[in-house]
């Protein structure tokens, strides 16, 4: 067993956070409460880890308490049971009944959003969504009040999807796990949720995400890919520079509790009474909540068909259905109850008699002893869930069948279908003919086959208990954290903006190298193609200020063609490199080619035809052609379809136009690029650097380099080029670089050779504004604020404007070195 002792040699604390505490609280008098622990799968699941962890529960106590004195009294009583209450006064109804049960629950169970008046639905949704976020914040506040360094937090279910994000924002060192106890739907269903992206991002903040089945995990990964555009791997999801592990943990029950209960004298007596009541008949059992997803109407329709087609069994079988009431206050549930009662009346009327009824329907819950007794005497367990998380009723039935070895007929849409599929008869509950046939097969099954099937299921239920589930999850969470930290160490840190500004202000010869697409280009909407790239209008004055500073040289290095760069930078005092350096241009001079004399471009027309073919057959894809390269881009196409098309496209290319060509083929995140061999941004910048030193007749070495862009992996040699040039003293190559004055920053990429990362191009824009102000303060002819900073709207980049204004006010702090007092 894994040793979980923390650095202090003590058991680490585990905070188990769920919507509801596992305690029933009843007021027994003024400021006094009676508490009773509620048994269940989650409680059982944590029994095995209480010896490893000091476990405390956090959740709603199940009662509304408004008086502070009563709150304190209940809190003190709950503390004795290691429970910490979250009082959700004022938000519970909108949070729980509204958003959780009215929005998330139907979506997760493939039922879709409520179909009501659109105007009312929008208003209601916003109110419920706000209450949901507020409730998650209230959980956070309670956790913060009780958090101790080193605590592990395990969040449960869809009620708390924002909590992992809130916890990491509070302290990103907290170990956070999140487990979903319901299904996760296909991406086509999930994407109808208005808050779809926000919820996905929030739970991806956790270190470990757990699901009941591989299907649920697969749907989640596919949804992350389609909605967030991230890659799902066998490890999980890499998002915003961190790894979130996604794994499968099928929950179980406490089988020993059921086995022990079946042997109690009072339960044995109940079993005898039930067998006497149903003497001479086979008993088919159903135990479900009266809920739309449980498929009770489908169960009755299949049973009706069975009785129609098998007259022999009409007086020899009885279906006992325990339908536990749930939400009688909801119209849909009242309608379901009426429908179920109608079916019971119809079937009993058709096939019943004065002395015998084929269906015994109970609209109530039963005590645990009676439940075990009826599980034990049943011949067949019939589970027809239309969509379910795990459905532990099937596990409970198996645990109680040690003597009788009855048959389990199980819906393929219940999570247990993937665990108990070997021993159960798996059915599609929507196919009443298939379910009817399965009932007949179960009733007629030979004893030897029943024994074999039961043995398989019984072994699984006993070895995959709730206790094992809890241990497995915590073992994975504790094992994945060091791995996550190791991954984080491989992932560069955020760019230290203040260090960049400080080094820039102290330097005398600065070099700034920037990409165009995804860096300086105007942010694109879904209808824009890369052929239409335009310089971000906020940067026009900024680049002008930087380029006119005699101490600063700016280079734009792009895969785009000469015409695009001319159109955007033609009038700037800037160095340009088109098609990854195949062509370069000094400020207002002429383009110079670096293309080898013997380069063969006969492949271009053939590749262009293949790209055109796939563009026509991949909606929202496009391709860009330049003199030495072509790029097919499917960034705005359906992600999975685009990837499949890209695989086919590559096969077409290798089989045809590039089979014998000297080209490089680069597979990007959402693109395929074919270009003349041998040219990369790293090779280009070495040549451009030599030209800069020569043409500017530099006498002072370059003592500051900032290099940033949204580059393909093969072009990241531009970062390693400068790493190799970092020297302890001035060198003849025109560089005087040290670790402290070289800054490379990849934009929005978790895996990179750059030293640092920037979340988005907005961060680069913001930094360039600030560097332009520093450059402006050291020049005689200063630009106006509006020339340097040209926001597209009045509210854009308020932080940048405040910083710029503060520097304007502090010009007196700038000395001869140009250093700004920070």
UniProtKB/Swiss-Prot annotation:
GO terms for biological process: trehalose biosynthetic process. The keyword Transferase applies. Residues 12-479 are annotated as: Glycosyltransferase. Keywords: Glycosyltransferase, Transferase. CDD domains: GT20_TPS, HAD_TPP. This is Probable alpha,alpha-trehalose-phosphate synthase [UDP-forming] 2. Its EC number is 2.4.1.15. InterPro entries: Glyco_trans_20 (IPR001830), HAD-like_sf (IPR036412), HAD_sf (IPR023214), Trehalose_OtsA (IPR012766), Trehalose_PPase (IPR003337). The keyword Ribonucleoprotein does not apply. It catalyses: D-glucose 6-phosphate + UDP-alpha-D-glucose = alpha,alpha-trehalose 6-phosphate + UDP + H(+). It is an enzyme of class 2 (transferase). GO terms for molecular function: alpha,alpha-trehalose-phosphate synthase (UDP-forming) activity. In the N-terminal section; belongs to the glycosyltransferase 20 family. In the C-terminal section; belongs to the trehalose phosphatase family.
């Amino acid at each position: 067993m894994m040793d979980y002792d923390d650095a202090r040699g003590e058991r680490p604390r585990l905070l188990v956070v769920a919507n509801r505490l596992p305690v029933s609280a009843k007021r027994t008098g003024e400021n006094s409460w009676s508490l009773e622990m509620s048994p269940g799968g989650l409680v059982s699941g944590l029994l095995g880890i209480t010896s490893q962890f000091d476990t405390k529960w956090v959740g709603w106590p199940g009662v509304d308490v408004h008086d502070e004195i009563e709150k304190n009294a209940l809190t003190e009583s709950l503390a004795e049971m290691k429970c910490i209450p979250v009082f959700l006064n004022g938000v519970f109804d909108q949070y729980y009944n509204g958003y959780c049960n009215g929005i998330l629950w139907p979506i997760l169970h493939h039922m879709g959003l409520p179909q009501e008046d659109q105007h009312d639905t929008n208003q209601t949704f916003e109110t419920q969504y706000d209450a949901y976020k507020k409730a998650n914040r209230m959980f956070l506040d309670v956790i913060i009040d009780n958090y101790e360094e080193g605590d592990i937090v395990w969040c449960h279910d869809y009620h708390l999807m924002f909590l992992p994000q809130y916890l990491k924002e509070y302290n990103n060192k907290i170990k956070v796990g999140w487990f979903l106890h319901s299904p996760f739907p296909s991406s086509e269903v999930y994407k109808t949720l208005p808050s779809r992206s926000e919820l996905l991002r929030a739970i991806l903040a956790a270190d470990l995400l757990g699901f009941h089945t591989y299907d649920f995990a697969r749907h989640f990964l596919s949804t992350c890919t389609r909605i967030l555009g991230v890659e799902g791997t066998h490890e999980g999801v890499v998002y915003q520079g961190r790894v979130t592990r996604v794994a499968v943990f099928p929950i179980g029950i406490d089988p020993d509790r059921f086995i022990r209960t079946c042997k109690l004298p009072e339960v044995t007596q109940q079993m005898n009474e039930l067998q006497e009541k149903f003497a001479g008949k086979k008993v088919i059992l159903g135990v479900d909540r009266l809920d739309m997803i449980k498929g009770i109407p489908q169960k009755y329709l299949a049973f009706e068909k069975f009785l129609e087609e098998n007259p022999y069994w009409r007086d020899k079988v009885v279906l006992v259905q325990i339908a536990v009431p749930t939400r009688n206050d909801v119209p849909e549930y009242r309608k379901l109850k009426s429908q179920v009662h109608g079916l019971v009346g119809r079937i009993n009327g058709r096939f019943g008699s004065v002395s015998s009824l084929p269906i015994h329907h109970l609209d109530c819950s039963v005590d645990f002893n009676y439940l075990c007794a009826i599980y034990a005497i049943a011949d067949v367990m019939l589970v027809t869930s239309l969509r379910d998380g795990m459905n532990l009723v099937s596990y409970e039935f198996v645990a109680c069948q040690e003597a009788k070895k009855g048959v389990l007929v199980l819906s393929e849409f219940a999570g247990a279908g993937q665990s108990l599929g070997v021993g159960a008869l798996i059915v599609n509950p929507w196919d009443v003919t298939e379910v009817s046939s399965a009932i007949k097969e179960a009733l007629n099954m030979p004893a030897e086959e029943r024994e074999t099937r039961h043995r398989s299921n019984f072994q699984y239920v006993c070895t995959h208990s709730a206790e094992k589930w809890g241990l497995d999850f915590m073992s994975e969470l504790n094992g994945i954290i060091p791995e996550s930290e190791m991954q984080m160490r491989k992932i560069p840190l955020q760019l230290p903006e203040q260090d960049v500004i400080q080094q820039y202000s102290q330097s005398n010869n600065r070099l700034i190298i920037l990409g165009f697409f995804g860096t300086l280009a105007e942010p694109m909407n879904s209808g824009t193609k890369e052929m239409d790239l335009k310089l971000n209008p906020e940067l026009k004055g900024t680049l002008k200020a930087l380029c006119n500073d005699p101490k600063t040289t700016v280079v734009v290095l792009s895969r785009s063609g000469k015409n695009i760069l001319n159109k955007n930078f033609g009038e700037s005092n800037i160095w340009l490199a088109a098609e990854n350096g195949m062509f370069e241009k000094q400020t207002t001079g002429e383009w110079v080619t670096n293309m080898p004399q013997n380069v063969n471009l006969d492949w271009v027309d053939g590749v262009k035809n293949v790209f055109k073919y796939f563009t026509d057959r991949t909606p929202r894809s496009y391709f860009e052609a330049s003199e030495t390269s072509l790029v097919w881009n499917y960034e705005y196409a359906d992600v999975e379809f685009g990837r499949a098309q890209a695989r086919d496209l590559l096969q077409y290319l290798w089989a045809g136009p590039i089979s014998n060509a000297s080209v490089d083929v680069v597979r990007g995140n959402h693109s395929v690029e074919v270009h003349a061999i041998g040219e990369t941004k790293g090779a280009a910048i070495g040549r451009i650097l030599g030209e800069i030193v020569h043409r500017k007749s530099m006498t002072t070495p370059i003592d500051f380099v900032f290099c940033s862009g949204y580059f393909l992996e093969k072009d990241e040699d531009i970062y390693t080029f400068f790493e190799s040039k970092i020297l302890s003293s001035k060198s003849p190559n025109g560089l005087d670089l040290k670790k402290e004055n070289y800054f490379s920053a990849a934009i929005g990429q978790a895996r990179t050779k750059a030293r640092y990362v920037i979340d988005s191009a907005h961060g680069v824009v913001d930094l360039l504004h600030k560097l332009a102000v520093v450059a402006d303060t050291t020049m005689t002819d200063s630009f106006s604020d509006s020339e340097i900073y040209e926001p597209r709207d009045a509210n854009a980049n308020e932080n940048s404007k405040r910083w710029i204004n503060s520097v304007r006010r502090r010009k007196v702090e700038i000395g001869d070195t140009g250093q700004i007092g920070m």
